A protein has these predicted regions:
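Gram-negative bacterial Sec-dependent N-terminal signal peptides
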Residues: 1-21
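Generic secretory/membrane-interface signal
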Residues: 4-6, 15, 170, 342, ...
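Short, Φ-rich (hydrophobic/aromatic) sequence segments
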Residues: 14, 136-137, 235-236
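C-terminal auxiliary extensions adjacent to catalytic cores
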Residues: 23-45, 49-56, 60-68, 72, ...
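Long, structured ligand/cofactor-binding scaffold of large enzymes
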Residues: 46, 52-75, 80-192
C-alpha cells in the first residue's frame, strides 16, 4: 500500500546492547499514512505528538473556554446534544465560575456514561488501538476543542498499552458515539481495559500505567465520542486485505491460464489499446508480467482460439478492483488527517460572509486569549468512505466470480484437455468433483455481502438524526469478502497446480513463467499433488497461508 504523504518518523537505537527500539512516529494531524497508523496499532511503533500540533490543540481549547464564558449557544458545550440541543447547560454571563465549570464537568461525565451502549464482542485489540491512533491524529487538527490532556492520554494509552474494551457493534455510521465513548470511560477511570494483555478495570489500568484520570469539561466528551474512528479502523483493515487479494490476482490468474493452456490474446497491448478504460493498460501489463517467459507465448495448435469468458475478461475486473482500492485508500487518508467534529472549532476560520450575515457573525468568538469560530457542521458524515468501501466490495465480488468460474473450467476436461476433475490417472475416486461446493458457497456469500448497505436505516434521536451510512457494516462486509476471496484463490491454486502437474506429464517441455513458478513452488511445499482422494480441509487452509505470505 503506497501513500504520497511524507513520513515523519524518528528511530532511536539502543547502542549499548545493539538492539533497535521501536520507531517513534510523530503525529501532527495532517501527515499520517495508513501504513504508519497500522504500524502503531500493531505495537511496532510508539507515538509522539508534534509540539506545534499540541499548541494548536491548546489554542483551540482556549477558544472553547472563551465561547463558554460568552454564553453563546454552542452544541455540546453550553447546550446539550442531539434532540437536547435546545437545553441550556449553564449560564456563564462572561465568567467561568466554579459552578459553571462543575456543571460542564458533570455534563461531560454523564455524556460518556450514557453513550457507552455498545453491543457484541470486544473489538480485536489491534483495531481498538488503530481507532485510537486515528482519533488522536484527527484531534491534532485542533478542530475538536478538546483540552490537550485528551490528546496526551490517547498517546499514553498507545505507548503504555492501555486498550479500552470497545464493543464491536452498535453504530449506524454517523459517528460511532456508542462505541468510541468507551475510550472516554476508561480515561475517567471507569469501564474496562486490557493492560499489557490483561483485562482489568479502567481504574486499575490507569493506576498500573501511571496515567492520571481525565477530568472532562468543555467539549471533551463530545470530542472523544463523536467521531468515526472505530468504523474507520475496520475500513483500514478491509482496505489492506483487499489490497493483498488484488496484488495476488495477476499471478493466481496466470497460473490458472497456464493450467488451462489458455490464450493470452485478451491481455495483449494491441487488444487493450482498442478500449482504453482507466487502469486497463496497467492491469493488462501486470498480467503479462506474471506470464513472461511462459509457454503460453509460444504457438500451440492445440490451444483454443478463444477461452471461456472469465479467462478473457478478468483483466477488466483487476483494473476496476485496483482503482477501487486506490480510491478507498485515498479517501481513508483524507479521513484520518482531517476533522469529523461537530461543531468544528476553527482558529483559521475566514471572515468570508461574516460582515454580511449576523448569523455567520454569531459563530465567531473574539476572545482575549483566542479568536476564531465554532461552527455547526456535517463533517461527521463519512459517506465518501462508505461509498468507496461498497464500490470495492462490488469490485472484489467480481474477482471472486471470475475465480470461481475459472476454477470450474479447470475441472472440465472439455476446456483443459486433461482428466475430468483433474483426477490422477490411477485415482478411481472423486478428485475435485465434490470440492466445487466450497468455493461456490464462498462466492454466494460474497454476492450477498456486495449489496449496498449505506441506505438502510430509520430516523433516530427524535427524528433529528435521520440519515446513516452504516460505515462499519460496509467495512465488515468488505473484510468478509476479502477473506472469502482468499479462500477461493486457495482453491483455485489447488486446481491450477494440479492442472500444471497433469499438463507436464502430457507436455513435458511446457514452461511456467518465473512468477507463476514461484507461486507453484511455494504452494507445493505445503500442498502436495493429489494422487489419491484425501481430506482437503487442511489443504485449503494451508493454501491460504501460502497466499497470505506470498
Amino acid at each position: 500500500m503506497t501513500n504520497s504523504f511524507k513520513l515523519t518518523a524518528t528511530v532511536s537505537m539502543l547502542m549499548a546492547c545493539g538492539l533497535a527500539q521501536a520507531a517513534t512516529i510523530t503525529l501532527d494531524g495532517s501527515n499520517l499514512t495508513l501504513d504508519q497508523a497500522w504500524e502503531i496499532a500493531r505495537g511496532d511503533a510508539d507515538v509522539a505528538i508534534a509540539p506545534a500540533a499540541l499548541k494548536h490543540v491548546e489554542k483551540s481549547y482556549q477558544l472553547v473556554l472563551e465561547a463558554a464564558a460568552s454564553g453563546k449557544p454552542v452544541y455540546g458545550l453550553t447546550v446539550g446534544v442531539g434532540l437536547n440541543k435546545d437545553k441550556k447547560l449553564f449560564t456563564a454571563d462572561g465568567k467561568l465560575t466554579p459552578e459553571v465549570l462543575q456543571a460542564s464537568r458533570e455534563f461531560n461525565y454523564n455524556a460518556l456514561r450514557a453513550h457507552s451502549a455498545g453491543i457484541g464482542e470486544a473489538m480485536p485489540e489491534t483495531l481498538a488501538r488503530l481507532a485510537m491512533v486515528v482519533r488522536l491524529n484527527t484531534l491534532l487538527t485542533g478542530r475538536s476543542g478538546a483540552q490537550p490532556r485528551v490528546a496526551e492520554i490517547y498517546r499514553d494509552f498507545l505507548n503504555k498499552h492501555v486498550t479500552p474494551v470497545i464493543p464491536s457493534e452498535g453504530t449506524i455510521g454517523e459517528a460511532d458515539i456508542l462505541l468510541a465513548s468507551h475510550v472516554g470511560s476508561v480515561m475517567i477511570g471507569e469501564w474496562r481495559a486490557n493492560y499489557k494483555g490483561k483485562l482489568v478495570s479502567g481504574k486499575e489500568a490507569l493506576k498500573a500505567a501511571g496515567i492520571q484520570p481525565l477530568v472532562p469539561s468543555g467539549k471533551d466528551a463530545l470530542a472523544i465520542l463523536s467521531n468515526n474512528a472505530v468504523a474507520v479502523a475496520y475500513a483500514i483493515e478491509a482496505a489492506r486485505n483487499a489490497q493483498k487479494v488484488v496484488q495476488l490476482t495477476p499471478t493466481v490468474y496466470g497460473l490458472s491460464l497456464e493450467g488451462l493452456n489458455g490464450n493470452i490474446a485478451p491481455i495483449l497491448p494491441q487488444t487493450i489499446a482498442a478500449r482504453p478504460f482507466p487502469n486497463l493498460k496497467e492491469a493488462a501489463a501486470e498480467m503479462r508480467d506474471a506470464l513472461k517467459g511462459s509457454s503460453l507465448f509460444d504457438e500451440d495448435k492445440s490451444r483454443a482460439l478463444q477461452d471461456p469468458l472469465t479467462f478473457r475478461v478478468t483483466v477488466f475486473g483487476l483494473a476496476e478492483a485496483e482503482r477501487a482500492v486506490k480510491d478507498l485508500n485515498d479517501v481513508l487518508t483524507v479521513q484520518i488527517n482531517s476533522s469529523d467534529d461537530n461543531p468544528a472549532t476553527l482558529l483559521d476560520a475566514t471572515e468570508e460572509l461574516r460582515a454580511e450575515s449576523t448569523r455567520v457573525d454569531n459563530y465567531f468568538i473574539d476572545g482575549k486569549e483566542a479568536k476564531g469560530a465554532i461552527i455547526p457542521s456535517g463533517n461527521f458524515n463519512p459517506l465518501p468512505v462508505a461509498l468507496a468501501l461498497q464500490r470495492t466490495s462490488l469490485a472484489m465480488a467480481h474477482l471472486s466470480h471470475y475465480a470461481v468460474q475459472r476454477t470450474l473450467h479447470l475441472s472440465d476436461d472439455h476446456f483443459t484437455g486433461l482428466s475430468r476433475f483433474l483426477t490422477d490417472p490411477t485415482n478411481k475416486g472423486h478428485a475435485f468433483g465434490a470440492i466445487q461446493k466450497a468455493y461456490m458457497a464462498m462466492h454466494v456469500e460474497n454476492m450477498s455481502l456486495a449489496n449496498p448497505v449505506s441506505l438502510f436505516g430509520m430516523p433516530v434521536a427524535g427524528d433529528i438524526e435521520d440519515t446513516f451510512t452504516n460505515l462499519m457494516l460496509a467495512a465488515k462486509n468488505l473484510n468478509r469478502i476479502d477473506r472469502n476471496t482468499m479462500q477461493i484463490y486457495s482453491l483455485e491454486t489447488l486446481h491450477a497446480t494440479q492442472a500444471i502437474d497433469l499438463r507436464l506429464v502430457k507436455t513435458p517441455d511446457f514452461k511456467l513463467s518465473a512468477p507463476t513458478k514461484k507461486l507453484y513452488d511455494a504452494f507445493r511445499k505445503e500442498v502436495p499433488y493429489v494422487k489419491a482422494d484425501r481430506q482437503f480441509t487442511d489443504d485449503i487452509a494451508n493454501g491460504v497461508k501460502v497466499l497470505e505470505a506470498f
